[in-house]
Amino acid sequence: MAPDITIYRSSFESVERQPNKPLFELPDGRTVSYRDTADTVHRIAARLLEDGVAPGDRVAMQVPKSPEAIALYLATLQVGGVFLPLNTAYTGAEMRYFLDDAQPRVLVCAPDRRDDYDAEQRGLVVETLGESGDGTLLHSQDRSDAVVDVGFDDPAAILYTSGTTGRSKGAVLTHGNLAANCAALLQAWQYTSEDRLIHALPIFHIHGLFVAANMTLVAGASMHYLSKFDTDVIIDLLPHATVLMGVPTFYTRLLRSERLASDSCSAMRLFVSGSAPLLASDHEAFAARTGHAILERYGMTETGMNTTNPYDGGIRKPGTVGKPLPGIEIRIVDRETGEPMADGEVGIVEVRGPNVFAGYWQMPEKTASEFRSDGFFITGDLGQIDDDGYLCIVGRDKDLVISGGYNIYPKEIEELLDSHPKVLESAVIGVPHPEFGETVVAVVVPNSGEQLRERELQDFVARDLARFKQPRAVRVVEALPRNVMGKVQKAELRTRYADLFVGADA
């Protein structure tokens, strides 16, 4: 869907339509209206201009989640800046890398971290913003409502990828990317000003900011705005909300609560899950408990959202991420030749549409290598299209295990392991092997109170897997390493078990 108005201007149309409507509903009972938010945006815009921010300058943010942080995002767009949200967990060398690479004009950080960044040496203006709106950013009462006229091809934000395979890359998202993706999601999920979203996601990530917040701002909806996920708080809010956007760990935690029931979900119309795969068993258990089928979608930092299971007019299939959003094309190609593959065959997922980013910040060669000549972006995800046209993500291409010349897809083994009654979850990786190049290792978390033995699990999967796919080793752990969005960090596991077969007999 081609955009016709930017996120900033759409958001301020919402302000004009309903200035007194609550945009943020906070845990302490306070509300912040659209008018109040607009006033904060204009105060921050004046401060950014005073700090010397010109169109195209980067404004970095590493602050606790607050309504003022969303206002900072909008103020950056207002003055023509490029918004750079950074994970609040980053420290030391990580932050130095992002600041040196993006070279922001302004960094807004938590008050207690003001002196952490060698600001003078970098020519960096440092402002502070705390969780309660305190800090230097809002010291002045000056306001600016002047809006820089930007084009849809102009950069709006830079989001850094997780960098699990080397140097973290800054994905440049344009005003057109953000607006087009938001418009497609509003249509697909029928999100309107009547919705009340439970927002418990971080706002330095595409899901929490460019999906949840953008949709709410543009639709003129309201959100219960939480600093973090808390099972009891979420369940208390369900009768007063219509939509929850989350990650799989949200739903596994909700399922552990005896308080989760269909009665508490009577006002809800939509539960969305993404950023990591949702177990089919959790999908089914949630539907049985609440009467709601979770809607899974597929997106990534470079593209925003690409596909979605249907809101209506079709079934939501566990283990799939649905069909392309309006205006977006998806295809599956051979990982070696790049030739299109038939439905049902596993290959690389490629995407084309107005949602696809402009490129990687200051990495023209890397950008060129990630696009086909016809404009399709090579996602690096492995997937297949089923008989109904639904996309199923099999895993990351970098997670593919090649053992003795055979391609092994970890998800197939993980699904089998997860079906064992004593297993809570699993992650399958490839590690170096002297004879086969790589071999399969399974890392497994047992259900509470259960004891698991390696041989027990190896025997269990042997009934349904060819010998070359069977884990040569199983390691039982208390928990899998995850990032803040709940994705299992397989690179960390590969490092941890890299020497498992060093010196083994070939």
Model-derived features: where do they sit?
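Gly/Ser/Thr-rich phosphate-binding loop
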Residues: 241-246, 255-316, 329
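ANL superfamily adenylate-forming
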Residues: 112-152, 167, 258
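AMP-binding/adenylate-forming catalytic core of the ANL superfamily
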Residues: 90, 107, 353, 358-359, ...
